[in-house]
Amino acid sequence: MTDTETRLKALMLRGLDGDTAAYREGLALLGVRLRAYFMRRMSGAPGDVEDLVQETLLAVHLKRSTWDSAQSFTAWAHAVARYKLIDHWRRRKIRQTLPLEDHVDFLADDAPDPGVALELDRALASLPQRQRMLVSDVKLTGLSLAEAGARAGISEGAAKVALHRALKALAERMRRADG
């Protein structure tokens, strides 16, 4: 766990327990991280950067109860920031690719739970072959729905429906595994 992750997580936990000073400090520290994250992705738009920082901090505040304190805070906050950035680009119809190495400094260094990975492998294995192939092609390999559908011998629309059903079945299986 990084020093920033440790500090942010401790501040947010104290904030959730009612320590408003710690909560404010945690949001301020997160704001600095978010500003740097958005600046790397938003060249020439400092006003947009500030808007995104504020939107993300507001979303973190409003959705703080959804954060599982047993998990990484920075990974959760990064997901919120990423969705806010995607929403921003959609509003402006901007498409950009983000190199993975840009995310390394923000991501937590916690290793994934091997039990979860094993359960996910089991859940994938329980799917019918076509659904398993679609999940692998679209979500793991990065093929488009049209490409994955062509590989499976079905239309893009049928691939979309089959993928949706597969992901729904996986989510249900994982929920049942959590107890």
Swiss-Prot record:
The record's principal subcellular location, in a coarse class, is cytoplasm
Name its cellular compartments: Cytoplasm
Q: For the motif Polymerase core binding, what are the positions?
A: 51-64
**GO biological process: one example:** DNA-templated transcription initiation
Query: Cross-referenced SUPFAM superfamilies, in alphabetical order?
Result: Sigma2 domain of RNA polymerase sigma factors (SSF88946), Sigma3 and sigma4 domains of RNA polymerase sigma factors (SSF88659)
Q: Which residues, by range, are in coiled-coil regions?
A: none
Q: Name one Pfam family in it.
A: Sigma70_r4
GO molecular function, a single term: DNA binding
Any one cellular component term from GO for this entry? cytoplasm
Location of the DNA-binding region in this protein: 145-164
Q: Where is region (Sigma-70 factor domain-2) located?
A: 33-93
Q: What does this protein do?
A: Sigma factors are initiation factors that promote the attachment of RNA polymerase to specific initiation sites and are then released. Extracytoplasmic function (ECF) sigma factors are held in an inactive form by a cognate anti-sigma factor (NrsF in this case) until they are released. Up-regulates expression of 4 operons (sigF-nrsF, CCNA_02834, CCNA_03001 to CCNA_02999 and CCNA_03363 to CCNA_03366) in response to potassium dichromate (K(2)Cr(2)O(7)) or cadmium chloride (CdCl(2)). Overexpression of sigF leads to higher expression of its regulon.
- Protein name, entry field: ECF RNA polymerase sigma factor SigF
* Record organism: Caulobacter vibrioides (strain NA1000 / CB15N)
Q: Which gene encodes it?
A: sigF
